[in-house]
Amino acid sequence: MTTAFQASIKYPLIWIINTANPSESEPSINKANKRIRKMVRFTDWLRAHYESAYHYYLAEHLHEYGIENGDIPNFLGLRVTEAKTLHISLYRKSWSEVYVDVIIRAYVDIFTGDESTPNRRKSIVDYRVRGYYDLYEKRCHLFQCFMPYRPEDDMDKLQLDDYLVPIISKNDLEDTVHWFLEEHYPYAFLNPGRINIKAMIRKMGLHVYKTGLSEDERINGVLYLKGKRTTLYADDGTSFSADIPDKTILIERNLCRDNPKKANHTALHECAHYGLHSLFFLFQATYIEELHQYFDPIDVDKLPLDDKGHKEITLMEWQAKRLTPRIQMPEEWVDEKMQELLPKYAWMNEFVMYEQIIKELAEYFNVSKEMAKYRLRELGYSDTRGVLNYINEAYIPAYKVPSEISPYQTFDISFDELVKIFRTDRKLRDILHTGDFIYCEGHLCLNTPPYIEIGNDHNPKLTDYAHEHMTECCILFTKQRILKYDYTAGVLQDTIPEQFQKAFISGTPAQKIRWTTFVKETKVKLPSNFTDIVAYYIENFGL
């Protein structure tokens, strides 16, 4: 076992086949990569366990298949002098089984001529060894098929990366929805409309229960692929231990009571994880079990998770979050419903029309208004970002968002966010020094006609003109949000992620010129001492 071979496999153990008894192999410490990590690649685990077996298998069986060089005159035999793994392709077979294609390059000596004085020439040929591995039953069927390598023989299945996470691009999401429903709930196509999530769960062979999942209710749902003893919480908040069966979804009970649509969404989110990522979590659980078998007791929670591991977790959450609304609202179903709703509300102005359409879609598909709005925007019907926005615990009036505004920019800002930015962003403080802006309807708007008027409740509100021309009167913010997801080996859970969010003023070129002028004019008028400045803020900005 060479140092280069050990270094190429990022796994703490390596199994070397016993050529005297090929059915046996013994593990040894991988001195070049003996560091134990929280997450590993399936391809490294596969090579650590079976690479020597693959190469032995090739050497022993190549003579049965030949080397596809046509008829070789006076052929006597061949011998494999070296084998090299070129590539491993992975495909989903089922929720627990992964297809494995290993492409191996064989360096071969071909013997021809007379047996007493044979001629030898060298040849290089590539082969494909195809099989599958059952991660739930831990059964190896890796050596099912042996064939010369041809790219056109690649499988037409859902392809997986080295960690067993599906390879899905943004452009593949709608097609993936069709695959998901055909694979797990084909009955959906018989009656397009509202997805029966309970029926889907049963069809997928899963079970669902509601219970208390955490003290702080940060965990919305959990999927246990394999049975496990865990801590749950009763109605009064007391903890208790329970044995969870295989393939079980648990939903936070308070979520079911307070927000049934969100509970349905969470259950479907776990179904999406099961359909897409069960192989990943089954394998990582297998890896942890193997660590406990061959190493001293280890605290899995304290093992390091590298950047690639974090990226895989984020990727899986992105896939589940992007796929779930598409499963609940497939593109063709939305198109069909929109053909009915658009003529119904065509007499309204655009953003008020879409406010009504979103409400009807949410009711029809049994989803939240936010999800219905999100799907319409994705499908290109209209920029619905200014419709049904929930700020300061209330829906704010609809407004038009110009097409040039990026997805990361917004006119909306909560009072709490505004206070945070006010403390840290000098540009905002300079703008507010002008006294020309008012905080109204979740926006910072110019406090002047034709943008602000007094409503029937004697409070200020944005005018219809302001709602149609937001870039003229309202400050534009850019928001950045970084999500950090929890990772527990072998468990899929929908956890409210830890969020790091900041917002800062951006604005269109015209706004920036106007704000710069305001700032210059106002700085001349500002008080010079701290006490007067505080009084100035209270009097002019209402903060």
Annotate the PLM regions.
Residues D101-S239:
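Contiguous, non-catalytic segments that form substrate-binding/exosite surfaces or channel walls
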Residues I201, A320, A372:
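Divalent metal-coordination and catalytic microenvironments
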Residues Y209-A267, C271-Q284:
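Active-site scaffold of zinc-dependent metalloenzymes
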Residues K308-N349:
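Short helix/loop segments within enzyme catalytic domains
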Residues K261, H265, L276-K311, E340:
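Post-HEXXH active-site segment of zinc metalloproteases
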Residues F5, Y11-A20, S28-R92, E97, ...:
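Pan-zinc metallopeptidase signature
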Residues L173, G193, N264, L268, ...:
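Hydrophobic (often cysteine-bearing) scaffold residues that line and stabilize catalytic clefts
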Residues I219-D243, Y287-L303, F411-E417, F422:
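Charged, glycine/proline-rich intrinsically disordered loops and linkers
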